[in-house]
Amino acid sequence: MSFAIAVSPHGHSQKSTSSVMRLTLLALVPGIAAQCYLFGWGVLFQLGLAILTALVSEAVILRMRNYVVSASLKDSSALLTAALIAVAIPPLLPWWMVVLATAFAIIIAKQLYGGLGQNPFNPAMVGYVLLLVSFPAPMTNWMAPQAVTAQLLSPAETAAVIFQGKTSEGLTNYQLKTLVDGSTMATPLDHLKTESKRGHSVDTLVTSANFTAVSHEGWRWINLSFLAGGILLFMLRLIPWQTPVAMLGTLAAASALAHYLAPAQFAMPEIELLSGATMLGAFFIITDPVTSSTTSRGRLVFGALVGGLVFIIRHFGGYPDGVAFSVLLCNILVPLIDKYSQSRVYGH
């Protein structure tokens, strides 16, 4: 019997880059569906705009670099970046903002560094932070869930708000936001941060009917949907367990300790874990294999740092949610984390 001689590695993974990206996009579907149910057609419009912008931007830059455009676009990495930006922004954001964020993410945060696998920062978070820093008011202008709002927007009305700034009846994005009980709607984290600064107790705020039914309940379902997608990624062995577990564990521990010491100022862990972009960040952002740590111990450190920074920024910073800033700050530390978390080589 003859045996073939081949060089290592002898074990090969059947998962290509494109298949990993497409499976990750599939895992995003529950979260996207939850957002569509709660916020309406705007989510799909933003998704379409982001995808179109990502593909065009990537194709133009690849052509300028004399790369084969069709082959590079097939890896679906641009689609994933676009999807992450689309689910992170308010559904009725003006069209040019999502175009700006996506183009910046693809051209500056990804291709300028050399393309897929070369970027030190998560492109989707770079694009998101660009909008958050440049246009903070529109980026915090979230709609109330459709189940409680007085204005259910059709696809045509949604398109009118996104592309023209107002509905056929003349209602602007801000006016649509204030149709629920005559008060402006906010994400749970934004609501708690604003009202606690006015002297209201967090314990009282989280038990109010408005917070439970209108604000937190919807975001809880969104986070649970992204959690379901994250579990799918675990089952498919596409992401390591260390990074999300470390992030969520650190955030839960910090919020539990803070709530125990000062319940009037800090919300319970359940609020922290199921509000904002917590689950999206834990399973789809910080698990990016390019911009996160590559060692087992390093992933624990990286995730713990992100979780700790999220808690600090949420409660002591100027923004209600700190996932994007935390991820980008920790991206800077990845080379240092990897250097000091390498396992000792046998024999040395």
Swiss-Prot record:
Belongs to the NqrB/RnfD family. Its cofactor is FMN. It is an enzyme of class 7 (translocase). The gene is rnfD. The chain crosses the membrane at residues 20-39, 67-87, 124-144, 221-241, 244-264, 266-286, 300-320. It is found in: Cell inner membrane. The modification FMN phosphoryl threonine is found at T187. Keywords: Cell inner membrane, Cell membrane, Electron transport, Flavoprotein, FMN, Membrane, Phosphoprotein, Translocase, Transmembrane, Transmembrane helix, Transport. One of its GO terms (biological process) is electron transport chain. Disulfide bonds: none annotated. InterPro entries: NqrB/RnfD, RnfD_bac. The complex is composed of six subunits: RnfA, RnfB, RnfC, RnfD, RnfE and RnfG. GO terms for cellular component: plasma membrane. It is a multi-pass membrane protein. PANTHER family: ELECTRON TRANSPORT COMPLEX PROTEIN RNFD, ION-TRANSLOCATING OXIDOREDUCTASE COMPLEX SUBUNIT D. Its EC number is 7.-.-.-. This is Ion-translocating oxidoreductase complex subunit D. Part of a membrane-bound complex that couples electron transfer with translocation of ions across the membrane.
